């Protein structure tokens, strides 16, 4: 609740509005540093996961996450949870019944379909009608708790089209609107775009991202591929932002402040916003430094996420990468100038190369510094002088000058 209270008090006015309970909330012995193979899980009589009451005391008495969700909603926030694809192996072992059917868990499970990194579940055999019934039952339970957001894991690597479609049907039948986010997205191909749009609200385009420059730099190519296909209700997701104090009770690594430099953090948030990736945090907000709050509340940057269209990479020349987008509320244009190299870059760029139409004049403001831009001329044409630092960004909003 400390994270939720902090978010409501400091970040909600800037659009940060959802708190998600991450992986293995149903395992009493869950730990940092990995997963327990063959763990005993807290399940109900129909093989559905229940919050471990030693970790979530408000779930006692069969209340599930409803008391916690109610508290989150009272703060003006939305409540989400993580869930693994399929049905618990424990339910299969115990031949638990599937609610509302004559089937049991061992009849609807596909025991050949397993997650490579977690032993909690088997996949479902969707040739058996009880498989859909299991997902329907699970989502009815989540809806009764007041869940608004579901991160469904182990869905995309490989691509489990049948599981994804079944989960979508279960949400639609649940009687509650819930956002469906799919993970983990390893080497996700655009060949799946139509199916993703039909069944999910957002989907990861990479494996887990951590606080290393190599992880951030790799997202440039992925988001250049996916950004032109972003649209409301169908979002390619570049993964959580590893800023502030991270890795508390994480699968990998020890608790620490992010290893990303301030410039790298600004680059990351700028790329995510101009590519219109959903923004999710994976940090402990109350113990994060004040500069993290400043990073996450820059309206000039966040506005690009919510009021832009036609996001695209314009140029990749050595370590210089240019992105552009257009405002949905005015004639303004957004331009991000990234430097992925280890030394500073100074260039003068014609405004025409930034996608700014003529005729007419433009003024520009840099979002991170708040300073006016260094507009100049190059070979008689209007131009922008830029000097982004190593691993850094300069992020501009251009407005037409009225005569």
Label each residue range with its predicted role.
Residues 3, 7-143, 147-149, 154, ...:
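Aromatic-lined carbohydrate-binding/catalytic grooves of carbohydrate-active enzymes
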Residues 266, 272-275, 280-282, 316-356, ...:
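Carbohydrate-binding surface patches
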Residues 107-113, 126-127, 133, 177-284:
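Glycan-recognition surfaces
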Residues 15-22, 78-83, 143, 148-153, ...:
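Structural recognition of the beta-strand scaffold that forms the well-ordered cores
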Residues 267-315:
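Catalytic cores of secreted or luminal carbohydrate-active enzymes
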Residues 138-186:
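Extracytoplasmic, non-cytosolic globular domains
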Residues 352-370:
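Solvent-exposed beta-hairpin/edge-strand motifs
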Residues 377-403:
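C-terminal beta-strand-rich structural cap/linker in extracellular carbohydrate-active enzymes
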